[in-house]
């Protein structure tokens, strides 16, 4: 997942805003607190989608399966309410998501994130801003009421 918050450069496989026009549904993250640490130095974390670089000050979030992913401080403040105890609660922000219909790579400025057809959801946070979420994690952390694929 940011695994969950990625600015797309462009994917040869066609993940663009237009890709979401058919088959996407409205969703939001459940308000279940997540755990995080603040990076004190630059580094790399191995996300479920591949290695991702981060900088000092980025928040390293631990997901429901123990997976980790970095989020820059601005995105963190935009998408989470900091509980000031090493946890944060996702804000209820409506987004669009779609189950990947092809294998590919989301190319972010800090690394490539792989996704597989039928195994990963692509979440559209805003124009040109996407995240990749494993299917089982998506079902645990996002509202799936409007998902016609399940």
Please annotate each region the language model reported.
Residues 3-64, 73-129, 136-140, 144-150:
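A motif-centric signal for short, conserved binding hotspots located
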Residues 69-70, 133:
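Signature of WW domains and closely related Tyr/Trp-rich beta-sheet microdomains
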């Amino acid at each position: 997942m940011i695994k969950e918050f990625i600015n797309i450069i462009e994917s040869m496989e066609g993940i663009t805003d237009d890709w979401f026009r058919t088959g996407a549904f409205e969703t939001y993250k459940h308000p279940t607190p997540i755990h995080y640490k603040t990076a004190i130095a630059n580094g790399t974390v191995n996300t479920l989608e591949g290695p991702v670089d981060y900088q000092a000050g980025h928040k390293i979030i631990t997901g429901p399966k123990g997976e980790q992913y970095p989020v820059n401080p601005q995105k963190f403040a935009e998408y989470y309410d900091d509980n000031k105890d090493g946890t944060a609660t996702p804000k209820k922000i409506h987004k669009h998501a779609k189950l990947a219909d092809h294998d590919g790579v989301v190319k972010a400025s800090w690394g490539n994130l792989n996704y597989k057809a039928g195994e990963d959801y692509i979440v559209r946070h805003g124009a040109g801003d996407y995240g990749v979420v494993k299917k089982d994690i998506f079902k645990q952390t996002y509202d799936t009421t409007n998902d016609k694929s399940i």
